[in-house]
Each structure stands twice: as C-alpha cells, then as structure tokens.
Amino acid sequence: MNIFKQTCVGAFAVIFGATSIAPTMAAPLNLERPVINHNVEQVRDHRRPPRHYNGHRPHRPGYWNGHRGYRHYRHGYRRYNDGWWYPLAAFGAGAIIGGAVSQPRPVYRAPRMSNAHVQWCYNRYKSYRSSDNTFQPYNGPRRQCYSPYSR
C-alpha cells in the first residue's frame, strides 16, 4: 500500500507541475515596442477654481448622496431617520412567516388496524401492504383496503 501511495503522490506532482507550466507557455511574447507619437502636445486647463473651493464637495446636511426625500408625505415615514420607509406591516409579515416556517411538522400516526382486518385483506388481495393498508388493483393506482373488520 505504501508503494501505491508514493506512486500516486508522484503522479499528482508531475500532473500539477505540468499543468502550471502550460499556461505560461501558451501566452504570446510581445516583442514590439509601442510607437511614440511626437506630434501630441500636452494642454493644461488654466481655469481658476471657484472662490471658496477647497478640493472637496461642500457639506449639505439632510442629503444622502443627493437624495432629497419624497415629494409628498408617506405613511410610516418619519423625518430625520435613515431615509428609508419601513411600514409596520412588513415587520409583522416577516414575523408571521418566520413563525410559520419555524413550526415543526405535524406527526401523523397511522391508525392501528386489527389483526382480523389485516388477515382479511391479505386473504382477499395478493398485493396488499399492511404498512399503508393499500392494495394494487389490475387497473389504476393503489387503493385502500376496507374490510368488515375495519373501524
């Protein structure tokens, strides 16, 4: 087993080494030099900045990235908060859905059939299954077995 492990490790090392070299060999070599165009002149804009400009945007309180809010009042919106509108119904719906999802699934117990009922169904139908009290007719899907002993 030890020889097999060493052979596999060696094979993987060769494979990984070969695949890491292949992409570098596939890249073309760019031996051309870029053409320098001497006919281009650098132009500078000599306009003066505005009078009280310090290089930054001015502070505008109440605006978040230029958003000035809604034009008309919206229900559930409160001034001087984070700028978003959160109706109470959204939180209520989330709580209801979360509560419904977290509920455990109901466990249904199969009704206990009497031994006489099970024996009667086994005698009547060859394809009877006592685990779910069904039999397979010649035509159609499985059906439930009803006997004179069933409750």
Swiss-Prot record:
GO molecular function: carbohydrate binding
Chain ranges passing through the membrane: 83-103
Main location: membrane
InterPro entries: BA14K
Topological category with respect to the lipid bilayer: Single-pass membrane protein
Pfam families per the UniProt record, alphabetical: BA14K
Annotated keywords: Cell membrane, Lectin, Membrane, Signal, Transmembrane, Transmembrane helix, Virulence
Signal peptide (from-to): 1-26
Annotated Gene Ontology cellular component terms: plasma membrane
Localization in the cell: Cell membrane
The name this protein goes by in its record: Lectin-like protein BA14k
Organism phylogeny: Bacteria, Pseudomonadati, Pseudomonadota, Alphaproteobacteria, Hyphomicrobiales
